[in-house]
Curated annotation (Swiss-Prot):
Pfam families according to UniProt: Pyrophosphatase
Family label: Belongs to the PPase family.
MF-aspect GO terms: inorganic diphosphate phosphatase activity; magnesium ion binding
Compartments, record wording: Cytoplasm
Organism encoding this protein: Rickettsia typhi (strain ATCC VR-144 / Wilmington)
Catalytic class of the enzyme: hydrolase
Protein name: Inorganic pyrophosphatase
Catalytic reactions of this protein: diphosphate + H2O = 2 phosphate + H(+)
Length: 178
């Protein structure tokens, strides 16, 4: 995969997300390697938990932790790692881990991909139980790993998510301009 050919924005309201980990998959953390385009096993998680949503990142972005902006894609089905899915951001999970701030954009597939998410425009439109599962997963998925921790600090709205995406795009452009 030529990641440099995939832009962060599909259009003004849509982002491209490259999936690394399918929802409900085994307790394995995969990471996309930008140099080779391959998906590597980062580690086997010691907790027997599965990701509650498809997990990936927005290409052509850079977050404060030095990685691309992370995204949780709410969907009805697992998405194959390496797939690019067009999404709409609806909010953000605010959290910190042993490396610092580590926000996760919450997104849903675009209407063209799945019209059943058209009514979900903001985080408050999501099922409360799904939000609880997301928080529970991230509060506990590193519990059995040495020197690793996570603290969920709250939720941010759609505007906050869009701001973080724009900052990630700008930060990445600045990196390449310097």
């Amino acid at each position: 995969m030529f990641i440099d050919k995939i832009k962060a924005k599909a259009n003004n309201n849509e982002i491209n997300v490259i999936i690394e980990i399918p929802m409900n998959s085994g307790p394995i953390k995969y990471e996309f390697d930008k140099e080779s385009g391959a998906i590597f096993v980062d580690r086997f998680m010691q907790t027997t938990m599965s990701y509650p949503c498809n997990y990936g990142f927005i290409p052509d972005t850079l977050s404060n932790d030095g990685d691309p902006v992370d995204v949780l894609v709410v969907a009805h089905h697992p998405v194959v790692p390496g797939s690019v899915i067009k999404c709409r951001a609806i909010g953000v999970l605010m959290m910190e881990d042993e490396s610092g701030l580590d926000e996760k954009i919450i997104a849903v597939p675009t209407s063209k991909l799945d019209i059943t998410f058209d009514h979900i425009q903001e985080l408050d439109d999501l099922c409360k139980m799904l939000k609880k599962r997301i928080v529970h997963f991230f509060e506990h998925y590193k519990d059995l790993e040495k020197d690793k921790w996570v603290k969920v600090t709250g939720w941010g709205n759609k505007v906050k998510a869009e701001d973080l995406i724009k900052e990630g795009i700008d930060r990445n452009q600045q990196k390449w301009n310097n």
